Amino acid sequence: MSNKKAVILVSGGLDSTTALAIAQSEGYECYTLSFDYGQRHRVELEAAQRVSDKMHVAQHKVVQLDLKSIGGSALTDDDIAVPEDGPEGIPVTYVPARNTVFLSIALGWAEVLNAEAIFIGVNAVDYSGYPDCRPEYIAAFQKLAMLATKVGVEGKPLQIKTPLIDMTKAEIVQLGMRLGVDYSATVSCYQANVDGEACGRCDSCRLRRKGFEDAQMEDPTRYAN
């Protein structure tokens, strides 16, 4: 067992699962963290558990959050439809402050575990335009981690690792395949049905499908239509 630990934010989707595989390839003992935050696509929690089991992580933790009560996103508010037309600008699927909340909790757990790093599968190339997926956001949170934690003050700051941030979706798929990721276990769709079948029309589905097409890899995604 490795003597270096990492917390991996795992949604059950393509990117976060690849980030987990990268962390394992770098020799980290991995602790996966997922959130039940009132999201529309709750089957992602089943996928996160499935991925964590298949990849034999040290521990998988699910934290309960009530972001649904805040609303403001198509992923947490049933009255806001998930767009299927590739809108310009920041889409309504953006969940206000989500990555800030997630990373803050990951930071706390990482301190408790005496972990060295937190991995998050954000991407700023083939992505939906979320402000909390950009390199400058991650750099700002890294500064916060150095200032707001005991380990940071003591000169042993946790590293926020974003191995996918400058990669295309095709490059992510290709790397994951080389690392042995089983993408059939993952769910990326914003409105997947209870059987985990993807809609094939939302922005997340389009990006995922394009990634497999550009990588010239077979897409194992189960689509409802």
Swiss-Prot record:
InterPro entries for the chain: QueC, Rossmann-like_a/b/a_fold
Alphabetical list of PANTHER family matching this protein: 7-CYANO-7-DEAZAGUANINE SYNTHASE
Database matches in HAMAP family: QueC
Residues engaged in binding Zn(2+): 189, 199, 202, 205
Catalytic activity entry: 7-carboxy-7-deazaguanine + NH4(+) + ATP = 7-cyano-7-deazaguanine + ADP + phosphate + H2O + H(+)
Cystine residue pairs: none
Cofactor(s) essential for the protein: Zn(2+)
Gene designation: queC
UniProt keyword list: ATP-binding, Ligase, Metal-binding, Nucleotide-binding, Queuosine biosynthesis, Zinc
Domain of life: Bacteria
Protein's name according to its UniProt entry: 7-cyano-7-deazaguanine synthase
Function text: Catalyzes the ATP-dependent conversion of 7-carboxy-7-deazaguanine (CDG) to 7-cyano-7-deazaguanine (preQ(0)).
Record EC number: 6.3.4.20
Family, similarity comment: Belongs to the QueC family.
Entry-linked Pfam families: QueC
Cofactor note: Binds 1 zinc ion per subunit.
